């Protein structure tokens, strides 16, 4: 369309997003999606689903968790025995497991709500904040267990777990921005979910 332009942004996570610009764009009537002037309602509903989808990406950390547990079971610790036998490793893995399970419960709750009706914005926002921050927390814990070599890229000498933790670590950082920054979404949870006054 005339007046529409796109500028790509290549992220540290290895994916591309875009900034879009609209200047005097005229949309032909045949291309209108939904009702005229109903775009805000449409986009906010879509954003709720995007937020839930971003939270669901934290399920990818379950595979990282399983790989890390297996690695810890089969890798000798510097202090003797296996990494999995070290109390610090057990505590980190236990905490990661608890966070993953809590995220799964919240994700299932939101999926149930979506199956019954549209998801409420405050619940989608809470799910996104918890899910994306859980993803970061779990990967931090797994990197504590695996050590610095967990941050070595796939294909590089010394990469552990085929570089999966490094790859996921880069991706999980940018997920906190998609669908709205977590700081903004916390305000939405407070105002829409808890009836608190606006923070700003």
Which residues make up each language-model segment?
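FAD-binding core of flavoproteins
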Residues: 1-70, 191-200
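Short, well-ordered loop/turn and helix-capping segments at boundaries between secondary-structure elements
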Residues: 27-28, 49, 70, 74, ...
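Tryptophan-centric aromatic hotspots in well-structured domains and transmembrane helices
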Residues: 20-21, 40-41, 71, 105-108, ...
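C-terminal helix-coil-helix/basic helical segment that borders enzyme active sites and/or dimer interfaces
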Residues: 73, 77-87, 101-157
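Structured core elements
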Residues: 5, 19-21, 102, 176, ...
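Glycine-rich phosphate/cofactor-binding loops in nucleotide/flavin-utilizing enzymes
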Residues: 40-55, 146-200
């Amino acid at each position: 369309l005339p007046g529409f332009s796109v500028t790509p942004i290549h992220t540290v996570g290895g994916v591309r997003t875009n900034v879009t610009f609209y200047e005097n764009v005229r949309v032909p009537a045949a291309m209108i999606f939904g009702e005229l002037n109903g775009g805000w309602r449409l986009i906010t509903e879509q954003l709720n689903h995007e937020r839930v989808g971003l939270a669901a990406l934290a399920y990818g950390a379950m595979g990282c968790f399983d790989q890390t547990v297996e690695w810890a079971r089969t890798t000798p610790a510097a202090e003797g025995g296996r990494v999995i036998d070290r109390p610090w490793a057990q505590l980190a893995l236990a905490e990661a497991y608890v966070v993953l399970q809590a995220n799964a419960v919240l994700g299932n709750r939101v999926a149930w709500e979506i199956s019954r009706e549209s998801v409420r914005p405050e619940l989608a926002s809470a799910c996104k904040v918890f899910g994306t921050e859980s993803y970061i927390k779990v990967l931090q814990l797994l990197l504590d267990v695996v050590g610095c070599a967990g941050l070595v890229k796939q294909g590089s000498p010394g990469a552990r777990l085929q570089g999966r933790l490094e790859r996921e670590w880069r991706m999980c950082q940018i997920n906190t921005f998609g669908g709205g920054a977590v700081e903004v979404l916390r305000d939405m949870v407070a105002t829409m979910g808890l009836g608190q006054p606006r923070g700003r």
